[in-house]
Amino acid sequence: MSEIRWSKLHSLIHDAPSDSGEYITIIDSLNDLIKETTIEDRRNEIASSKDIFFQLRESAILGKSVDLKQACSSQYMRIVKGIVIIARNLSVANQVIPQNILLPNTFLAWYLSISRQTVCTPGDLKQLYGLVCQFYFNCTRTNVVFDESCFDDHMNFMVEMLRFIDDDGIVNAYSLWLSNIMKSDAFISSLLNDIRSLEVIDKLLLRGIIAQKTEIDLLVEEEDEDKNLSSLATIQLKILKQLVTHECFGSYMKTLRKEYGFASFNKMFKIVTMLVTSSERWDLYQLTAILSWTFDIFEEYTYLVDAFFKSESTPEATDAGPLFAILSSVLDILTTLAKYQHAQKYMISYDGVHKIIKLFDILERNCLKIHFNKSSGAKNVDSSAHPVRATDHVGNVITDAVILKKRIHNNRINDSNFPGIKCFLVELLGFMSYEQKDVQDSVRELHGLELVLSNCIIDDNNPFIKERCIICIRYLLANNSTNQEFISQLEAKKAVDGDVLKKAGYKVDIDGKGNIKLTADKRNAASEEQLFEDVQK
């Protein structure tokens, strides 16, 4: 277009005339330029000039302050959409110039100005919204230039998406743009620390797009990792991954729980757990970010579990279900990441051994060890349950109906007995103590060895915990004479199951001076492969 035409265009945008005839010439010129931008060579040539992007920006700047009450809105919107289409097409060839002059931000502000006026049809607004998303996506394919002073416009633009959630095309355009803008650490930080993020992440993404338009919720419930995902679901998981691996995600989760309650908090946690536990590749920054907020929640829920047991028999007693659900998810994430040395070092450096043993001890003292005797024919005090043998932490058989009913109902273990949680804790101790003498010593000094040994039994509350404990004991004793001496003294008091030691690769010997000591017994040791296979059954 010539300079005169740009001048005419700018005047038209500024004046917003009511006569539809005044728009015809400019609309025809825009259509011609749009056609040119669809031809690759011509598009590349036009996009190489800074001038056209400055002219497009000037159009948007003028348009932001225009009152459209007297305008011929249908024709005016054709002009606006034409300008955005030209920018969208040109940004395929050049992303640097439009970002450097903050053209995406200017277009967002222009859209928001138009959306606040009542003269435009819903259809026109929806089309314009989608075009702005497409343009912004093109601009940010390789790099993101984010101006924090424009965050409010970005937030308002994201919230606008709630108006168009029924349109699949707009949903896809929005999702692609959002996945790109999430490359900006500054953008994510601003988002996660803003109360309005609840509306964007929980209401729009989780309960809107993800719940209504993807199979992600079904994937979480069915735990089917082989299920094929739609392209939209893949994009949504990419967005969530960018959020989860940011250091501010923990702050968002606390706000979510406080403002929207447990249901929303737990829904997010379930999806996040599925995402983290099914992903194999993390860089050090991502691991650190996930561990940071996850470990904080783990520590908080250790305190809450302790408080739960202390108040269990009082009028202030709370429901264990929410505690168990979140604790299971947190520990699922931690044990999944614990295979990485960086994660092990992180947990060790943040007093992880002490924190894990603290929760282990709380559960050991308050939860029952349960064995369902399905073929014994014995009668249980709770007639609704199958025959069961339940013992406390010192081995006393529990027959009190009130106590049993708190922990077992209809042949199912209640959440108040925190089923499976100790398995996670033993796995974490195993990961952290492998070839780490300082950790091995810490476990002994914190009385963790006794906890692990006392769980080398069949316990339906913690399936295959015996096998996990054997693996853990093997790691705790390896090349650690002090721990071996400690175990040998327990063995002398008949406090250790000899079969457990044998499977762990040790046996008790008496030397020439009559001293009891442990020696390696690899010939009778159970293979780790077999123990892991038993655990994974």
UniProtKB/Swiss-Prot annotation:
Keyword Ribosomal protein: no
Keyword Cytoplasm: yes
Subcellular location: Cytoplasm
Biological-process GO terms, alphabetical: cell division
Keywords: Cell cycle, Cell division, Cytoplasm
GO CC annotations on file: cytosol
Membrane-crossing segments per the record: none
Entry's family note: Belongs to the ataxin-10 family.
Chain's role: May play a role in the regulation of cytokinesis.
Protein name: Ataxin-10 homolog
Gene symbol of the encoding locus: CTR86
